[in-house]
Every structure is written in C-alpha cells, then in structure tokens.
C-alpha cells in the first residue's frame, strides 16, 4: 500500500510539472497573418499556434528591424511588432530561445504609395525604394511628418512638368525642410511622362523637399556620363488626368518666380496610403 501511494504521488507531481503553462512543450505556429505591412512603418504581425512564448527569437535578415512582442500576446497568439525596411519578399523565421526552428514564413511588402491631395483633385504615386532608397525615405519622411500640408504646385509648364512641395501661398518658402540629400539619378529609373523626381539647384546634391511630375517624356533630364540628371523615385498610378489639369493652368511671373499658376494650386496633404 505504501509503495502504491508513493507511485501515485510521483505520477501526479510529474503531470503537474509537465503542464505548467505549456512551458514544457515545443511551441508550434500554425498561422501567420500580417495586419499592417507598409514600407518604413511599424508592422503588426499575428502568430497563431500553441505554447508560444515571448522570449522566442525573430529573424528577418534586416527586413523588419527592432522586433518585439506586444504585452497583449498570449500562449496562443503572439503579436509581433517591427519596422519594415525593405520592399518585395522577405523571410520571417521564428526560433526558440535555444535556437530550435519553430516556423518559417515568406512575406511580401508592396512598394509604398502616397496620395497627393490638391485643390484640383487627387494624385497617387507609387514609389521605388529599391532603386532610390535615400530619395524615397526623404520624401516619405516629409510626407509622414505633415511637411507638405498647405504647400503649392508653384511652377507649372505644360509639355514639361509640374513642380511643388517647397512654397506656401505668396511664394513663401516653407520652414522645416530637411538637409539636402545625395543625388540618386543613376538608378535605372528615367524621366518618362508620369514619373516623379526631385527638384534641385545646379548642385547635384541639393534636393530637399521639392519634387516634380513629368508631364511628358523628358529624356534630357536623365543621368548620363556628362549629365548628373534628376533623380526619379516613383510614378503616378492614379490621377494623371489631374496632372494634366494642373499643367494646363494659366501662369504668370510672380514675385520674381516664372511659370506660377495665376490661381493657387494647393497641396492640402501628402499621405502614405500603402
């Protein structure tokens, strides 16, 4: 009888130890669902499974940096947050803190898109960070900080381009521009109709916030061995008819500036939408 009671007590103790919050079992992930996956922004990725732990190791090979698990994670659902640094495909690998592979998932980050809201309608741009990362990051930083709000398309030339993003009503230069960036004109992207590029001075590395949308193909603005060119970093994917309307507006010389629309073409906001 004594031996039977001892065996029963040992068995119960073993079962209790083995079920302590699931920590004695190998974690499994049965589903991965990204809720938000936007270039340059914080991503939220849900990992569903069993016996999950917040001390698991996340590997993305630099595609989604500073990973952390949200405090509202559970043993059935981990909420992963990280900052997206690439576009295209990347591999999300989850391991135990001991290095045992738990799950590998392939995710895709789309090219970022921004909406330019103007007094004459909306324009949607798709940007190319893989080709022009410095330029795209600079533009998105200005857009997401609200810098472009209430600026103008202040230079408009039909059959050439429309330029904006640096001045407010009365052609007052907007405060808060970032430092000039390095020219990325030798990227393979060219100044075709509907592409967007950075405006600059005669100094190739002088672009800050001003950009222009090509109204026609402008091959003479492209990079060559003898011409530094202008850095294209995206294209219009919606609203080219709005570009055409803006380009058609009557212009005049105002405060020493040429080709200024007689009626303000206001940029009310530039927003990252993808």
Residue ranges, per PLM feature:
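Sec-dependent bacterial lipoprotein signal peptides
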Residues: 1-18
